[in-house]
């Protein structure tokens, strides 16, 4: 029953989005309107002992779609492999609209990727959750470290480490078997936090 409700909510949202797109077309605004589909979080659907929740720092809650639609300005159906972050949206929009601003952004434009040009991936980055579950994390292409700052309501250990190459679904915590990796990633993460808070 719960799955059917979730599926119905997704179908309802699809129908609402279709109405918006049809209205833009009817008003002749498709070429003057950039439409962005994204989300602030994914969902745990039986993942990691969490049921229909969106807390935690596993990829099922962190990875969300980012779809840009701008008729006759952006290529339709183009899929870009890899990942970007929501901090990349603003610099991307300004870049594709040709708006130059003299402001620093943490994010980077996706326009080179849209044009088929290479862009070096961000090698590692900080992730956090600041809701009723307070956690810090550090992600590299190979590893994800999660450090809980308080009690975990899903009874997870204080430190989690996942090998994203061997275990992309993050099912096997290997923190105890890799204490040296935990320490290296913790140092990088805390150095970033200290720099950010200055």
Locations of regions flagged by a protein language model:
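A short, conserved beta-to-alpha structural element at the edge of catalytic cores
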Residues: 65, 69, 189-198
């Amino acid at each position: 029953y719960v799955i059917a409700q979730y599926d119905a909510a997704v179908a309802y949202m699809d129908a609402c989005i279709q109405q918006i797109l049809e209205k833009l077309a009817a008003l002749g605004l498709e070429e003057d309107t950039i439409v962005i589909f994204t989300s602030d979080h994914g969902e745990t659907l039986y993942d990691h002992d969490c049921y229909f929740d969106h807390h935690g720092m596993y990829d099922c809650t962190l990875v969300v779609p980012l779809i840009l639609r701008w008729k006759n300005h952006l290529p339709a159906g183009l899929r870009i492999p890899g990942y970007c972050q929501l901090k990349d949206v603003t610099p991307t929009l300004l870049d594709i609209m040709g708006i130059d601003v003299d402001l620093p952004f943490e994010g980077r434009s996706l326009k080179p990727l849209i044009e088929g040009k290479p862009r070096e991936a961000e090698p590692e980055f900080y992730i956090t959750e600041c809701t009723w579950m307070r956690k810090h994390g550090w992600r590299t292409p190979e590893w994800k470290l999660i450090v809980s700052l308080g009690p975990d309501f899903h009874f997870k250990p204080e430190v989690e480490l996942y090998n994203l190459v061997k275990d992309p679904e993050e099912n096997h915590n290997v923190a105890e078997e890799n204490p040296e990796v935990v320490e290296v990633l913790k140092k990088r993460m805390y150095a970033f936090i200290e720099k950010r808070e200055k």
